[in-house]
Amino acid sequence: MSSVKILMSNIAYGRGLSGSFADQVLRAYRHVYCRRQVQEGVVEAVRELVNAEKPDVCGFVEIDRGRAAGRAFSQLHAILDERYPHWDIANKYFRGTRSHLVPFLGRNCNAFCARRALPFERVYLASGIKRLVYKISLSPRLTLFFTHFSLRRSIRAQQFQDLRAVLDATPGEHVVMGDFNIFGGAEELAPFLRKTKLLVVNDPELPTFRFHRSRALVDLAMCSPGIRDRAALRIVEQHYSDHAALILDLHAVKLAR
């Protein structure tokens, strides 16, 4: 039976910082300057995950496409190989915001790669600073969206409304994956889920983020009711990031040719 496998990973800009207190405090300087060797080690670990899982589509948030802090090392291009010839990478900040012009932030990106050429769009939400949403057509009636929402709850609420409008304008079934930054709890998603009718695939007891002793469920996969029974999600720890990766299997689904 055909299936589609999607990997969604927040690699934390390849700084090699786990959620441990020691990493986040003693190695915090990596946010300003990070040796290429460290980033290459992270990229190699990501490649091992990709090789093991063999996803059809990989989505990355918090990926660095090369800047002074990283000695112009392009993490996505180091991850890619001949199995994933189709890709895109873009700054997550809308060009109309001042953040897009700040050199330190200019290389902060979202990206994806795929085994097949899939129609896609870069959609920018109307609210917030981080606005980029990738809209990828997996098949004529199935669309994948992935993004990275604001850390501010009030801005997230506006972004959820913005994304809802995009979903409403897109026919067929939907899959939404991303870093939702809902550190205050999943109840803030209730209006969005009610209006879109999306269902969360995550096990609520399995956190995806850690800092020291704190744990939180912030990285989510959602899908339309019509495909929920065919969706299975696994959480994969990443020692090089404070976020776990999501592996979503959609059974009885075929990618567009």
Describe the role of every protein-language-model region.
Residues 118-124, 137-139, 165-175, 180-257:
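Metal-dependent phosphoester-hydrolase catalytic domains
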Residues 6-10, 42-71, 144-147, 162-190, ...:
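Active-site beta-strand/loop signature of hydrolases that rely on acidic residues for catalysis
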Residues 1-7, 15-18, 114-119, 130-146, ...:
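Beta-strand-turn-beta hairpins that frame and shape the catalytic cleft
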Residues 33-39, 123-124, 150-155:
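Short, flexible loop segments at the rims of nucleotide/cofactor-binding pockets, characterized by
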Residues 14-15, 65-68, 95-97, 152-155, ...:
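Active-site environment of divalent metal-dependent phosphoester hydrolases
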Residues 16-22, 71-73, 99-102, 157-159, ...:
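Short aromatic-enriched loop/helix-cap "lid" or pocket-rim segments at secondary-structure transitions
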Residues 38, 62-141, 234-238:
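Structured beta-strand-rich core segments of catalytic domains in phosphoester-bond hydrolases
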Residues 1-82, 253-257:
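N-terminal, active-site-proximal structural segment of metallo-dependent hydrolase catalytic domains
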